[in-house]
């Protein structure tokens, strides 16, 4: 039973995707006692899984699984394995480690649409939930993508079988994706995107509190948000529930 549970009202909470950059297993075990109910996915950032003892990776995944949380390795690790011609080995290792989902992306590399489609299919055929990511890691490359380009790729991935599509925002949330160089949401582009994709299938990377507030006020508490720092999960949950000044009386 939660403290002050008499204040709770039923509401539809969107997905919360947390970024794990190498948290210790025992920390994860204790940490989940505080916020495990509010996490849906955990991404082991970029290629961090490849530099940690595999038994530790498995231990952490099991702690997350105990809370019904799906874990997946960062898209950069997929891109690295794919560029080495080791996609099958990558999927096999993901299965052995206990990952239930994978991320297909081209943020640091170039993958054709056909290759992207086939990678999604192969991952799905191997029993994984598939999240894809739209956007480039380097701002100078990402800014070459128009909002129409992003919309087309989101719909392409969903048609190819992806379960969710993540909009690139990186850890900074500045000068990339739907954010300007100050980190403010590009409202005009967001409006166009919202009219042309299934928002319920889109996950917005929103590392900054101001961005989380903007998306919640725009779409409501059911908006899907990613790149949430492990120590910001409770903060985000209060924003979703109107238990913090930024959203009080507005959700």
Swiss-Prot record:
The enzyme is stereospecific. Optimum pH is 8.5. GO terms for molecular function: phosphosulfolactate synthase activity; sulfopyruvate decarboxylase activity. Keywords: Coenzyme M biosynthesis, Lyase. The gene is comA. Pathway: Cofactor biosynthesis; coenzyme M biosynthesis; sulfoacetaldehyde from phosphoenolpyruvate and sulfite: step 1/4. Its cofactor is Mg(2+). This is Phosphosulfolactate synthase. InterPro entries: Aldolase_TIM (IPR013785), Arch_ComA (IPR022370), ComA_synth (IPR003830), ComA_synth_sf (IPR036112). It catalyses: (2R)-O-phospho-3-sulfolactate = phosphoenolpyruvate + sulfite + H(+). Catalyzes the addition of sulfite to phosphoenolpyruvate (PEP) to yield (2R)-phospho-3-sulfolactate (PSL). It comes from the Archaea. GO terms for biological process: coenzyme M biosynthetic process. Its EC number is 4.4.1.19. Homotrimer. Changing residue 137 to N: Loss of function. Pfam families: ComA (PF02679). It comes from Methanocaldococcus jannaschii (strain ATCC 43067 / DSM 2661 / JAL-1 / JCM 10045 / NBRC 100440). Belongs to the phosphosulfolactate synthase family.
């Amino acid at each position: 039973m939660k403290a002050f549970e008499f204040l709770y009202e039923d509401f539809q909470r969107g997905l919360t995707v947390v970024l794990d950059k190498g948290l210790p297993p025992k920390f994860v075990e204790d940490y989940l006692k505080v916020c495990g109910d509010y996490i849906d996915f955990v991404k082991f950032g970029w290629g961090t899984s490849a530099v940690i003892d595999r038994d530790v990776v498995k231990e952490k995944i099991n702690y997350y699984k105990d809370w019904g949380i799906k874990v997946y390795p960062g898209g950069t690790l997929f891109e690295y394995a794919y560029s080495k011609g080791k996609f099958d080995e990558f999927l096999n290792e993901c299965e052995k480690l206990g990952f239930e989902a994978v991320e297909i992306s081209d943020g640091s590399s170039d993958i054709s649409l056909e290759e992207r489609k086939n990678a999604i299919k192969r991952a799905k055929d191997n029993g994984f939930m598939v999240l894809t990511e739209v956007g480039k890691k380097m701002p100078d490359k990402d800014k070459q993508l128009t909002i129409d380009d992003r919309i087309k790729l989101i719909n392409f991935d969903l048609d190819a079988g992806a379960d969710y599509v993540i909009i690139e925002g990186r850890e900074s949330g500045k000068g990339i994706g739907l954010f300007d160089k100050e980190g403010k949401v590009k409202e005009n582009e967001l409006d166009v995107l919202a009219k042309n994709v299934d928002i319920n299938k889109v996950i917005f990377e929103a590392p900054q509190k101001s961005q989380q507030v903007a998306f919640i006020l725009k779409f409501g508490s059911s908006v899907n948000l990613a790149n949430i720092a492990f120590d910001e999960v409770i903060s985000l949950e209060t924003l979703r529930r109107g238990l913090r000044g930024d959203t009080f009386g507005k959700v």
